[in-house]
């Protein structure tokens, strides 16, 4: 075979053929169309060599088997038929692997996803390592697609219908223990003996597939299948609000295969794959995927970052505890937490312990690993142990003088190279750095709550921040598992600035007589994960609204909230879920009682009308203000690219991913249409809807954001 091939064949002395997967020049193995000829040549050689007793597929990469198919292949398809042909080619290749006359074993270490798992499913057996890096799944639905190389047909027959539906409809990934329990893999072994174990299994006679559990056998029958599909379809529709056509097609394709046979199932799978590839939803989701990949590769600066050996954190509260967790347990860096109160340190340590303990209970990690990771976190009530910290992240109260004091203390007690990164959500970084002796090493690093779950961070340099500081903080954020966007130091930064008018308008709709649940339902139907009112309850009404006066002072009355409404709610001691009093009623332990609205809220906010707008009208008012503000941020250079604006909105506030983010969405509508809608809303509701100069200019010139943002503003 050609040494540049991604697939190479080696026939051992014991007559076991080992096919090694190693895509040249790439960190991850991904399947590309041009590899089909390489694999077919190997399969032909195996079929012709009558001495071969078995076959093992194994990866040469350090931490992945096959991470999936190359998504660019789909972008090169111009029609549904071309994408369907791509799927049929994949199906045929997998069928040829499955048809080999000797046992074929997939030896899996690391990520085995998408087309990688479909290849493993085509094998006669699967062994995986017990490593935490090993995950197995079919995430195509997250790109608005379905598995197109036989996954919708082989997986249900291997693991049962309910497990397969859960995996394919959600993109859920299984860890080794879960994969073994479900029957997805036959054996778990240490990485050191993976090849040896796979070879031994390949020498054995082909084993008959394991019998499915009784529950799965019942669900596989016509009656059980009918009931399950009806239940899952209803549940899926509630979750997707009809915005993701892939889920419906997945159900149809799997049902076709089970009721009409595999041949019909494969045919339906290929057709559905082709049609879904051409949908706007899949295109938008793929755009988000590509944009996210680009952001993760973007160093944030042309300058080399500094070293990152140890990190300090000021404040052991909710944010400090979360930042300590991602720094120690994801970035793998030693963390020292300073809090004036020992209870604060204990809180932060307990926070990480609880998160790790949940992983132990779910058997994602072992108790020894939990202890090893916790050992990276220490605490102090003074600056002992801070002298050599490379970065100190401040996560104290939103008080300017306190943060300035923290800067002075860090400059006094830490090294000359130490970077001060503030987790402020509202205070300008230039103000925090105003009295710094080394302002070039002061920067904003805005995490979102809960830190361990939210993927986005905003990196906020002020005018004097050095390029090296920017590069170092971007590097740290990536190590912490975050997707960083670099934004300008202006009031509200980017995410909170576009979120505020959206929240304000929802509150204004309440005062006009719209019901809480009507507003939230309308925006969830549009595609947000939760409505704006529920979002306020979740983040805390006090926390979620504290930015509004800051924005109003900076940008004027378009950011003003309805008079006295927020203060009236807060004066009634309503902070949302965290104190069990908000717009919604909360039961024991802060759990919502079927998301019922507290009727008292309408008396508190002094409703002044009986508005009865349609869901579309409600959505339009809230979303158009967000879009207009995003366009302003683009014009002012708050974000460097439309790409960063889309990633920030999708990852930071849950802007509907299937729309591609605010800038992709505006491009799909067209600037002229966005301007026309804003002008109509201005005539109906006032000047806060006045279209910004950026949109007016783009409408006049027929421009779009993505075509005009190819160059870096940096």
From Swiss-Prot:
Site (Important for catalytic activity): 118, 140
Stretch list, region 3-hydroxyacyl-CoA dehydrogenase: 306-714
Catalytic activity: a (3S)-3-hydroxyacyl-CoA = a (2E)-enoyl-CoA + H2O; a 4-saturated-(3S)-3-hydroxyacyl-CoA = a (3E)-enoyl-CoA + H2O; a (3S)-3-hydroxyacyl-CoA + NAD(+) = a 3-oxoacyl-CoA + NADH + H(+); (3S)-3-hydroxybutanoyl-CoA = (3R)-3-hydroxybutanoyl-CoA
GO biological process annotation, one example: fatty acid beta-oxidation
GO molecular function list: 3-hydroxybutyryl-CoA epimerase activity; enoyl-CoA hydratase activity; long-chain-3-hydroxyacyl-CoA dehydrogenase activity; NAD+ binding
Pathways involved: Lipid metabolism; fatty acid beta-oxidation
Catalytic activity, EC: 4.2.1.17, 5.1.2.3, 1.1.1.35
Domain of life, per lineage: Bacteria
A Pfam family this chain is assigned to: ECH_1
One GO CC term, this protein: cytoplasm
Residues of the signal peptide: none
Compartment(s): Cytoplasm
Keyword Nucleus: no
Keywords, sorted A to Z: Cytoplasm, Fatty acid metabolism, Isomerase, Lipid degradation, Lipid metabolism, Lyase, Multifunctional enzyme, NAD, Oxidoreductase
Region (Enoyl-CoA hydratase): 1-190
InterPro entries per UniProt: 3-OHacyl-CoA_DH_CS, 3-OHacyl-CoA_DH_NAD-bd, 3HC_DH_C, 6-PGluconate_DH-like_C_sf, ClpP/crotonase-like_dom_sf, Enoyl-CoA_hydra/iso, FA_oxidation_alpha_subunit, FadJ
Main location: cytoplasm
PROSITE patterns registered for this protein in UniProt: 3HCDH
Disulfide bond entries: none
Assembly and binders: Heterotetramer of two alpha chains (FadJ) and two beta chains (FadI).
Family, similarity comment: In the N-terminal section; belongs to the enoyl-CoA hydratase/isomerase family.
Record function comment: Catalyzes the formation of a hydroxyacyl-CoA by addition of water on enoyl-CoA. Also exhibits 3-hydroxyacyl-CoA epimerase and 3-hydroxyacyl-CoA dehydrogenase activities.
Name of this chain's protein: Fatty acid oxidation complex subunit alpha
